């Protein structure tokens, strides 16, 4: 008997809930500021709205004319505010604020170009002729100029940056680095000393025995008896004991 009662109760409850609709339409609430508020529904809440005028999530789009705002983002003409130092200031506008200006004369962002003559400044970066200042030791000094400041100079005689070449005869020094003939100095103890020369100073020598720069190689480095080296730059004498 108890089982029958439970079964009948379950059937009645199922019939009641079976007739209840699964989805319900949105229930209109209170209308505020010409906007229809809905608790839930199938309205297209996220359709595009005019800039700065979004009704918010859950609000009906209403009668917003989106097409009327399609040109809101086009450039608008600048509104002139105040004129300072022959420059027209604009709050906003479609003027060419970033046009090229003469060097050192930028009107700044948001300023109209004014009457800047860019064409007259096109040659500002050309070389200007140097202004002669003072002559020292036969060298002409210039503050700036288009002279050939970095032309080759004679060895040990560089005029420095900004100095004119002067009368340096570069062609006359073309052989300065050619080998010069050796100059014999004083002869001491039967040994010949040389200041410089065109000899092959850097010929291969035995390890640890370099004659040094400016010394004639001669036969200085013939094998000698232990403890009897003639020294660097000294010519060897043929007084070695013969084997």
Swiss-Prot record:
Q: Give the protein family.
A: Belongs to the C-terminally encoded plant signaling peptide (CEP) family.
Q: Which GO terms describe its biological process?
A: cellular response to nitrogen starvation; nitrate import; regulation of lateral root development; regulation of leaf morphogenesis; regulation of root development; response to ammonium ion; response to auxin; response to nitrogen compound
Q: What is the lineage of its organism?
A: Eukaryota, Viridiplantae, Streptophyta, Embryophyta, Tracheophyta
Know the name of this protein? Precursor of CEP9
Expression induction: Induced by nitrogen (N) and potassium (K), but repressed by auxin. Repressed in shoots in response to ammonium chloride NH(4)Cl and osmotic stress (e.g. mannitol). Triggered by nitrogen depletion.
Q: Which gene encodes it?
A: CEP9
Entry keyword annotation includes Transmembrane helix: no
The tissues where this chain's protein is expressed are given as: Expressed in lateral root primordia and in lateral roots excluding the meristem region. Also present in the aerial tissues, such as leaf petioles and the shoot apex region.
- Which keywords label this protein? Apoplast, Developmental protein, Hormone, Hydroxylation, Secreted, Signal
InterPro entries in the cross-refs: CEP (IPR033250)
As given in the record, the signal peptide range reads 1-26
**Residues bearing PTM Hydroxyproline:** 48, 51, 55, 100, 103, 107, 152, 155, 159, 204, 207, 211, 223, 226, 230
Q: What does the UniProt PTM comment say about this protein?
A: Hydroxylated peptide is more active than non-hydroxylated peptide.
